[in-house]
Amino acid sequence: MRVSQRLGRFGEDVAARHLSADGAEILARNWRCRDGEIDIVARHGDTLVFCEVKTRSGADYGSGPDAVVGRKAARIRRLAVRWLAEHPHPPAIIRFDVLSVYRERQGSVRVEHRRGAF
């Protein structure tokens, strides 16, 4: 596994723990179809949450939410429609979140959770 893949997996693990600690139930991780992948699908109360996770090892690449705009956000919405087609009876409320996981050089980890990011 490449360094970038390990960093991404680390970030998704941290994000899933963060969501669980916040009271969410993780329904799927790395859900795939032919059109792409959704990092995390969770249920938080009556809300179904589709999560994109961006992991950064520094500030060189900007913030996570800044990376999920335009085509990327539209692709995640399309993937959510596919997920919903395969999983009937979703909750009435659907939300798209971006979780940014920052792994600092000194080993500390910070999570920024932007609810309803797009």
Swiss-Prot record:
Belongs to the UPF0102 family. SUPFAM superfamilies: Restriction endonuclease-like. It comes from the Bacteria. Disulfide bonds: none annotated. GO terms for molecular function: nucleic acid binding. This is UPF0102 protein Franean1_1156.
